[in-house]
Structures are given as structure tokens and as C-alpha cells.
């Protein structure tokens, strides 16, 4: 393997300009807004083979450089879709104007996560053209991460596997830093499952409760039990799993009618002690006990946003930590904080770590990112690529 050195500047792509170009694309999820077309044209110009992997109307882009299947394959995952802007009158700038003021770039998606996509694309273009590695570099971008669509990153991974394309390692460019770029990376995230409870009793007149079976006491008792039951005490890298009661509803406008049904919603975030199946079994034990106690029927439908993912500390996380420390001067802590990300679709394919900017203004009015941070992230990604392909089999 050739010794890899720092890239020269002749193939430089300005990550700030690319971020601005992407922000100007109005990509409120799941609209493509020409962002993937822009990326595809740029990457193709610099030697990447690009293919759209759209599924059920969801836009996705797969780009790969290199044809050496005997070498290692390194992947980057990100998204170009953004959340809605809310009321434009609340913004002090054009949400899609990409205005730069006093070293700050403003716009929806500037933090989450068009700057991350731009930084890696710029770093990868320089790397593969100036120090071509023995291996392949993949850039997998979806236009529907914010909706949690199963036709986004998951569709790309399924297409890769169906076409015998396997990455050895992936990084995801979500904002992971806490206060300053490089202070944290994510090696895992909690799983998320929403449970929709429906308790069914017997409707009746509130003046004759003996002729009815009110489902509300059963629901109240059940929810109290959930509130008092700790799922676990946490693990080495994860905080305790949590259950939040987010809705309670009878749909009953009459004050003198005992309702036939009542409903509640549970939002459960679970750590690496659990799978979604184990969580549902735990919920079922509680609902069966309430059925027996109150003589009601309880159904529990669910929506799984994603399983918990965890990449144990090892060669990949150390390489990323070392690269970040070399470029920023601080060694990032390994965390599992936050909600779910598209890493949940990648962790069964290969080891995955998340590394990106700070996220203090993501999804907020006047979302913005420091120009200096975008440039710094590009250098971090460039260092990761050089160290990865120059590690002589250490990872």
C-alpha cells in the first residue's frame, strides 16, 4: 500500500460554498430540491460513480469511488432533507438564503446537516484525487432522514447488499459535538419505540356504573405502574432507559357517559440492554396484569423508529478520536446521547461511528453554523480518510 500524505490543494472544493449551495436548495423533507442533483454532478466530475436509489418517492444518492474490491471500503452517510422552517416571519434572514454574516452561515439545514455533507464531500474529493487509496470510498446520502422513512438510508443499505457492495466501516455526519467541534463523537444511540395503548371496557351511564366497565381506572393504574417501574439502571455507555406518557384520550364529550374505550401513548427510549422485542414483552406483562385485574381488554400497537445501536470502543472509534485530536487539539469523549439517527440502519451492515459539528441551533429559527467549524470539519474528515487508508491493516 502506498504511503498516504496530506492532499495538495489543486482539487480543492470549498466546503463553505458547497454548504451554501445546498442550503439554497429547498429540501423540506422529503423534497429533493435539486440537492442530490447538485451533489451527483459534483461527485461525478471528480471520479465518483453516482446512482440514484430512489424508492417510493424518497430521493437517495449512492456515490462510490474506486473499484478495488480487495481493498477496504469506507463509507459516509448523511442527509440533505431539513425540517420545516415554521413561520418565516420569525426568521431574521431568508431561511434558504445561505447568508454569511460575521463568519456565520445562516439557513435551514446549515447545521443539520448540509454542512456535514459538504465537508465530507469536499474532503473525499481532495483525498481520492490527490492520494488515491487502495480501496473504495462511499458517500450515501438520503433525502428523507427527518421523517424516519424506511425508504431512505435503509433502502440504500438494502440496495448495496443486494448488489454485493459492502462497506467495512461507516461514519455518519450528524452534529455530535456538544460545545465545540471535536469534543464528542457518538458510538451508539438509544432505540425508540412508540406504543399506542387502547383499553376497552363496557360503555354505560355514569349513574349506573355497575352496568358498565369503566376502562379509565385500568388505564390510570396501568400508567401509574409504568411510571413507577424503572426499566433498568443504565449500562456502561448508556443512561437508563426511559418511558414517557405523551397522550391520554377518552374521546368522550359527554359528562354522564362511561366511555367504552380510552387510549394512551408511550414514548420509550431504550439502551443496549434491550431490543424492541424485549421492550414489547415488558409492556405486555404490564397490560396482561391490568386486564386480569380490571376485566378489560388492552391492545398495544407500536411504531419502531429504530433499534438501539452500539459500536463498542475499538479500532474505528480510536481512529476517529485520534484524527479529531490531531486536527482540533482535543480528544473527543465517546457518547450515546440524543435521539435516533440513520446509524440505526447501518450498524448491522458494519461498525459505525458518528462525528460532526455542534448542534446548538439545529431545527431552530435562524439555524446557523460557523464558517470556521465547516472548514475544521473538512480537515477532520480528511484526516480520518488519510489515517484509515494509511493505517496498514490496523483497522
Swiss-Prot record:
InterPro entries: Bact_exopeptidase_dim_dom, DapE_proteobac, Peptidase_M20, Peptidase_M20_dimer, Peptidase_M20A. GO terms for biological process: diaminopimelate biosynthetic process; L-arginine biosynthetic process; lysine biosynthetic process via diaminopimelate. It comes from the Bacteria. The keyword Amino-acid biosynthesis applies. The keyword Transferase does not apply. It catalyses: N-succinyl-(2S,6S)-2,6-diaminopimelate + H2O = (2S,6S)-2,6-diaminopimelate + succinate. Zn(2+) 1 binds at residues 79, 112, 174. It holds the Pfam family Peptidase_M20. Binds 2 Zn(2+) or Co(2+) ions per subunit. Keywords: Amino-acid biosynthesis, Cobalt, Diaminopimelate biosynthesis, Hydrolase, Lysine biosynthesis, Metal-binding, Plasmid, Zinc. Pathway: Amino-acid biosynthesis; L-lysine biosynthesis via DAP pathway; LL-2,6-diaminopimelate from (S)-tetrahydrodipicolinate (succinylase route): step 3/3. Its cofactor is Zn(2+); Co(2+). Belongs to the peptidase M20A family. DapE subfamily. NCBIfam families: PRK13009.1 (NF009557). Homodimer. This is Succinyl-diaminopimelate desuccinylase 2. It comes from Ruegeria sp. (strain TM1040).
Amino acid at each position: 500500500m502506498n504511503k498516504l500524505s496530506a492532499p495538495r490543494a489543486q482539487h480543492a472544493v470549498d466546503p463553505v460554498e458547497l454548504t451554501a449551495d445546498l442550503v439554497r436548495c429547498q429540501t423540506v423533507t422529503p423534497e429533493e430540491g435539486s440537492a442530490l442533483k447538485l451533489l451527483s454532478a459534483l461527485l461525478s466530475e471528480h471520479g465518483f460513480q453516482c446512482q440514484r436509489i430512489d424508492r417510493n418517492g424518497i430521493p437517495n444518492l449512492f456515490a462510490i469511488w474506486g473499484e478495488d474490491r480487495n481493498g477496504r471500503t469506507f463509507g459516509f452517510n448523511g442527509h440533505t432533507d431539513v425540517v420545516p422552517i415554521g413561520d418565516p416571519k420569525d426568521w431574521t434572514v431568508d431561511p434558504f438564503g445561505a447568508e454569511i454574516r460575521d463568519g456565520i452561515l445562516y439557513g435551514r439545514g446549515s447545521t443539520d446537516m448540509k454542512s456535514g455533507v459538504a465537508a465530507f464531500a469536499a474532503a473525499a474529493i481532495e483525498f481520492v484525487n490527490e492520494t488515491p487509496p487502495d480501496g473504495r470510498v462511499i458517500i450515501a446520502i438520503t433525502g428523507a432522514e427527518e421523517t424516519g422513512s424506511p425508504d431512505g438510508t435503509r433502502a440504500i443499505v438494502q440496495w448495496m447488499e443486494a448488489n454485493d457492495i459492502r462497506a467495512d466501516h461507516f461514519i455518519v455526519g450528524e452534529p455530535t459535538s456538544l460545545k465545540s467541534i471535536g469534543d464528542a463523537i457518538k458510538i451508539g444511540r438509544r432505540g425508540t419505540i412508540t406504543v399506542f395503548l387502547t383499553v376497552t371496557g363496557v360503555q354505560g351511564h355514569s349513574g349506573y356504573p355497575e352496568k358498565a366497565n369503566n376502562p379509565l381506572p385500568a388505564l390510570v393504574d396501568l400508567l401509574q405502574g409504568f411510571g413507577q417501574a424503572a426499566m433498568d439502571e443504565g449500562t456502561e455507555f448508556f443512561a437508563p432507559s426511559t418511558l414517557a406518557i405523551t397522550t391520554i384520550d377518552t374521546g368522550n364529550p359527554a359528562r354522564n357517559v362511561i366511555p367504552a374505550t380510552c387510549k394512551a401513548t408511550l414514548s420509550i427510549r431504550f439502551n443496549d440492554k434491550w431490543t424492541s422485542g424485549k421492550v414489547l414483552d415488558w409492556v405486555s406483562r404490564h397490560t396482561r396484569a391490568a386486564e386480569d385485574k380490571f376485566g378489560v381488554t388492552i391492545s398495544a400497537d407500536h411504531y419502531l423508529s429504530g433499534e438501539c445501536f452500539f459500536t463498542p470502543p475499538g479500532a474505528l472509534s480510536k481512529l476517529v478520536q485520534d484524527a479529531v485530536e490531531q486536527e482540533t487539539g482535543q480528544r473527543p469523549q465517546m457518547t450515546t446521547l440524543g435521539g435516533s439517527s440513520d446509524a440505526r440502519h447501518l450498524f448491522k451492515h458494519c461498525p459505525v461511528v458518528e462525528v460532526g459539528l455542534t448542534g446548538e441551533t439545529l431545527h431552530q429559527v435562524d439555524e446557523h453554523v460557523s464558517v470556521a467549524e465547516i472548514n475544521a470539519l473538512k480537515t477532520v474528515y480528511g484526516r480520518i480518510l488519510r489515517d484509515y487508508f494509511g493505517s496498514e491493516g490496523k483497522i
